[in-house]
Regions:
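An N-terminal assembly and electron-transfer interface module characteristic of large anaerobic redox
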Residues: 1-161
Length: 161
């Protein structure tokens, strides 16, 4: 089974935080997923956020014949490009964003993954893309791990039908 690992970010939040969570989530799912197709050869960050990368991501995921797409929202996410990729590929979709930290004393945030997930869900519904999600928890939380494993089992069933 091949999983398209498509971590996403947004420009107005911390790139460093997005890169940190991209790596941390990948380390956890590598132990679970049979085969991961990532974006490391698409751009220098290995993250989806630029409109210009959408055709390259779609082409790569088709060429690799992924069975599902996993979109971790590493700092917020870019709902428009996520929606375009998901709609083009028509495979099971999983959304997840790590639990957000408390805002700094000045009210600023490095990330707002939960809000990004709401925005992405709305765009996916607009594109008639069926999706599921894992609750905002830390990537090493058993809720994330069991949710990811359940998604893989569903993908296996869909693949055999």
């Amino acid at each position: 089974m091949k999983i398209g690992y498509i971590p996403t970010r947004r420009n107005n939040f911390s790139v460093e935080a997005a890169l940190f969570y991209k790596k941390k989530i990948r380390q956890i799912i590598e132990v679970i997923s049979p085969e991961i197709v990532d974006l490391e050869d698409i751009n220098s960050e290995g993250l989806l956020w630029k409109q210009a990368d959408v055709p390259k991501v779609i082409e790569k995921m088709r060429r690799e014949q992924v069975d599902a797409l996993f979109f971790p929202h590493c700092n917020f996410g870019s709902e428009g490009v996520v929606g375009q990729v998901a709609a083009a590929l028509n495979v099971p979709v999983l959304l997840y964003g790590p639990r957000d930290d408390a805002p700094a004393l000045d009210g600023m945030r490095d990330r707002d993954s939960q809000c990004g997930l709401f925005a992405t869900g709305k765009v996916l519904r607009h594109h008639n893309v069926t999706f599921t999600y894992i609750t905002n928890v830390a990537p090493d939380d058993m809720v994330f791990i069991s949710g990811y494993e359940k998604f893989l089992r569903v993908v296996q069933v869909v693949k055999t039908v």
